[in-house]
Each structure stands twice: as C-alpha cells, then as structure tokens.
C-alpha cells in the first residue's frame, strides 16, 4: 500500500510538471474577456473590444474560440464598459466566420452596445444607412442572396432599424420603419440593443436598454432560421455585405459602414428571454 501511494504521488508530480512545461511553451495570446458560457453553449461568438494592446487584432479577439480577426482597421475608444471600437467610412473588422453560429442557430440572438450621433450617413457622406454587421456572401450579384445584415437609417427624431435574414428556404426583413421608426436613439449616448428571434413563434423581438419594443416582426410560420453556413465567406462588424467596386458605387446602401461606436458584440444560437436580456443589460457588459 505504501509503495502504491508513493507511485501515485510520483506520477501526479510528473503530470503536473509536464503540463506546466507545456503551458510555458505556448505563445501568450494576451488577456481578453471571457463570457460565462459552457463549452458548446449557446453563446457562439463574442467580442468585447476591451484589448489595450498596440496590435489592433488582439483588441478584437473572439472570446469563444480565441479567434483573431483577419483585419481590424478601426481604432479603440471608450466603451459602454472598458474599450469599444470607433467605426469609419468604408472600414470594418473582418472575421472568417461567426464560429458555428449559423450551423447551430434555429432560434438566435444578436446583442451589442452602440452609439450614434445624428443622421446616419453612407460612405459618400450623404444621408443613408449604416450597417452594424453583415455576412460576406459567396454570391456576387447586384442583389444580396446568402447574406444577413443589420442597418440603422435616420436621425435622432426618428430612426429605422432593419434586420435582413437570408435562409435556405426564403428571406425576411424584420423592420421597425415608417410609423414604427424609433425616436431618441441617435443622441450620441450608449444604448444596448438585442434582437431575439424565437423559432417556436417565428417572431423577432427588439430590446433597447433591456425593454422590449412593442412592435414585433413575424416570419409567417418559418420556424428555425436555417442559414446556410457554407455560403458565409466572412463576418463583418461595422459594414454592409458589399464592397468597393461593386455596382452600387461608393454611396451604395449595401456597403455602408457604421460611423459611430460599437461594443460587446454577441451572437447566440438561442432566443434570449426577456429576463435574460434584462440581466445582460444590467450587467453593462
């Protein structure tokens, strides 16, 4: 018995020593925030933008898989919590994919903090929409098959919000426009936005600062969103799905970028409940 105990202690020591050496040999990735989410959990993509490195790629690491963006030309600024990113005309942060979000999502939620000041502008500097995020698409026509994107358009008096989703079986505009445009959200103040699609009811709910907008948008019995992951060529934060040189030109609404600030960008493969949205807003993260 004594010999067995000695052998166990010796093996335990060697195991600890081995893993310690392996950890020391790994290159440091730097510190980045990790959200409370178990492996394989519903939070599939999360960027806090809280990095303080001189390397902009490290400042935009996805915390779910420690994935670096392919490009980040945007500058850091004070955020809703810690640091954020400042949008710029024609620029965006490029990621290979939103991880496995499209594969797993039947219901889904997109959440972020944003700040905008006055009239939204296109990339030519005239009135037009500004895109929070989009998927680059394998389709290169003048329309927008296989992409998904979110745009704001308007000023502080009234602003439209439009969330477009393209699935394997159809497409849908979830909109708050016309008589349902939203006042007071372009006043250069941070606000928390959550878009929660529930496959059970085919309904999209918009929350602003933890409060549900009374206008919901229904996708006529569509059910699970069913996005084709194989058609997503990149995830863009801060710009629409089209690029310079496309047929719609520099002022084109589908390539317009976000000119304000963005922070704490999350994508879930589940529909957050009202209580979960309220808790997320209250956390200020």
Where would I find each of the regions flagged by the language model?
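Extracytoplasmic low-complexity segments
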Residues: 2, 17, 21-90, 231, ...
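Acidic glycine-/aspartate-rich tracts in secreted/extracellular proteins
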Residues: 50-56, 117-120, 168, 199-202, ...
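Extracellular, beta-strand-rich glycan-interacting domains
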Residues: 45-52, 109-118, 252-284
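Flexible glycan-contacting loops in extracellular carbohydrate-active proteins
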Residues: 216-260
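Glycan-recognition/cleft segments
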Residues: 128-168, 224
